[in-house]
Amino acid sequence: MCLTLFTAQADEGMWLPSLIGSRIKDMRSKGFKLSAEDIYSVNKASLKDAVVQFGGGCTGEFLSAEGLLLTNHHCGYGSIQSLSSVEHDYLTYGYWAKSRGEELPVPGLTVSLLVKMEEVTDRLAAGEKAEDIIAAARAEGKGYRASIEQMYYGNQQFLFVYQTYRDVRLVGAPPSSIGKFGGETDNWIWPRHTGDFSIWRVYAGEDNEPAEYSTSNKPYEPKRHFTVSTKGVDEGDFTMIYGFPGNTQEYVISDAVEYVATTSDPMKIALRTQRLDIISAAQAKSAEVRIAYAAIYSGIANSWKKWQGEVLGLNRLRTAEKKRAYEQEFNKWAQSKPEYANLLDEMHKAYDEVIPEYYMRELFSESIATIDAYSFARSLVAAIARAEGEGKTYDVETAHQNFLKNYNREIDQAIARRMVDEFCQRVDPERMPADLKVQISYYGGAEKYVDAMFRSSRLLGKDPITLSDVRGDALVNFARIFDKIYTKSRQYAFRNLSNAPQIEQYYRPYMRALREWDKDRAFYPDANFTLRVAYGTVAGYEYADAEYHHPVSTIDGIMAKDDPNVYDYNIPQVLRDIYAKKDYGRWAQQIYGKKSVPVCFLATNHTSGGNSGSPVINGKGELIGINFDRTWRSTMSDMEFDPSICRNISVDIRYVLFIIDRIGGASYLFDEMTLK
């Protein structure tokens, strides 16, 4: 019985494109019409050539032969913010270039295309050095970067080679009242009505190779771009997502699940709630603060809400309990295998050893390390030490003034008061820094100590500072209190608890054993921000309320939520006018028996962070949407995928086209797209 608990579920999996041939039969049974070579090939143009890593944390896709690129609004949010000001508030009002000359360059923004991936397990086992393999791959082309990534906790190794382009320009973005409609209120929620897209263009040198920004650069010509389907989706239609999911932990044991559900997530949720409340209150008072903290707030809130859904999902599915049952069945089998007989016992011991240290690192990272003044003081002391080690004098005043340019003392002090207090309440008393305990006792509480520190520190004032000022500053003394904790936390700065070496060493044999034992399970490697294929179908769902949730949302839902007095739901007047006249033009559809415009849809694709911006394609390989989210309780799919409730949320490509046309007035962009 327990052996079936984690047998691969329908639509579960994040498959390596180079090995997708093993899944084609199943994909075709669901409606896929293309071949494995159409998805991934190094010998001819394939769909992989139309997909990019966007900005280091998202996915994007080419829409034209002239480098036009589509991703999520939230993926480009920080870049749009960097181009915005009170006078040119592109976050609030959107931006639409009317010509190539109006496309706005974004310093530091890059996109990377996968050139190839290949397994190098045997080469490494034969004695080749990883650095030599990587160096040889990088030398094969201009702008190439390469890495060797571990699959199945090191049982297999794959080389990934990318080409990175550094001239990326903003072409168009809807106002946040469309691109972030629903804001954090609707984040991870269904039904959803967010026009979460932005449009960019990649530029290259004369040879179509990567080049630094130049007015002489030409639009990049991709080997492949997506045809855009305007026919839409119906429930049951095949869907495929091609992107770069960031992090899953499908094979961790029950100890890891329990830590996330009962300790880690609840602590992080509580601390982030307080930071968000402080920032939100300040944003409500000032347009300048609202813009300055827009991306920061979104970054904090995104994981904050995700973790809440993750806890709900893990508890509802009883994931830890099921893992324990699965482990018991595994252990019965393992007793006849000397190499595996004591494996789980050793893993449990390793978790017991590591969890206190890892929790300390997470607590520190979510509290003290979020204080801007602390981070500045610590980095300033480190920079001075480096300079003195080289026989130089560090320019502390220049660093001081650079820090103050974007520093909000009021917000940071409010955050510091709460975070120091929370740290003191949550830290193991035996790990409480003695000097911190003394200071808090002297001032009569954590918040009073913080107020005194901020009041006396010269690092936060406008007057010039010197090296002697730094050495005796109250903030510097505060930073030094945490020196040991900071150093130790860096030793535990792993992607997940289970990646700590003391634990991870056991996962390589554990994964090998699982694949030997559980032969009915379709294994796929955990996501690690490498290119993957996920597939499923358009589908609604029924949850605990016993109400069926349809898989398509419409413009009617936007208008039902519209409220000029609520920031998250205040849509542009032009959209109200279009709706009032039902003037949808070519984008009108009959949906649920009435004339409307589709906005978002649900599907059963297995996704994770990093899949934001991923193309959603139909069985013919045509673009039908842009992935941007999961439903709230689906976030536990990073640890367990359940097809009954796990749904990814995508913005319908027809809504994207509708906004480009009717709101942006940029229908000229259609001339370079392939619409079908």
What residues fall within each predicted segment?
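Bacterial N-terminal signal peptides
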Residues: 1-4
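Terminal presequence/propeptide segments associated with secretion/organelle targeting
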Residues: 6-676
